[in-house]
Amino acid sequence: MQQKNYQNDNDSVYRLFYDTIKGGDYRSREANVYRLAEVSNNIIDQCVAQGVPFARDYGGLLDNRSFGGAQVSRTFYARGQTGQQLLIGAYAAMNRQVAKGTVKSYPRHEMLDLVLVNGEAKGIIARNIITGEIERFGAHAVVIASGGYGNVYFLSTNAMNSNGSSAWQCYKKGAFFANPCFAQIHPTCIPVHGSQQSKLTLMSESLRNDGRIWVPKKKEDVEKIRKKTDKTF
């Protein structure tokens, strides 16, 4: 993010690389992380071009804030709806291609199985959730972008269908399952406030970087936490 380091606090590709490696407990693949750090500016530019309304300072430049234990303020945000606005921007860009006829979209479909031909993925079997019909889709290349499996945990900010079913279908057909510990769940998320909400809400990470801490609502709950911690360790 050094090219967008408007506050001039000596941010660089290497500092972003190091923070990401450290945040991954030094288990991440360094080549991939460094490439991510290199193209991070381009990713922000692409999001802006898609219409993501990132916050700006009074001079009109994109604003930054501290987030996730980083050494410097390098996080671009859109009020308290950053993730949602990123999704809206991505879906809007995709829908423009759908309208042009260059991309076909099949909403309300659930992946049931992966199709292999001579050991290579060549398509999927899916169910139409509206009609219940089983459909098949062939392709020269198959990319599984299922959003992880964070919803196997009781509290998670992942979407409700991020339940591990797609990863399991691929694993059954011989795909390697690497680093299952890399799961982001945010157990301190806020419960849903209505039947129409498909995921929980995160507040803890940004508040922590602003110096806030989580405390029990009742004083006596502190002892319960300490006793539970003592038994755990």
List each language-model region with its residue ranges.
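Glycine-rich active-site loop/strand segments that organize a redox cofactor
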Residues: 2-36
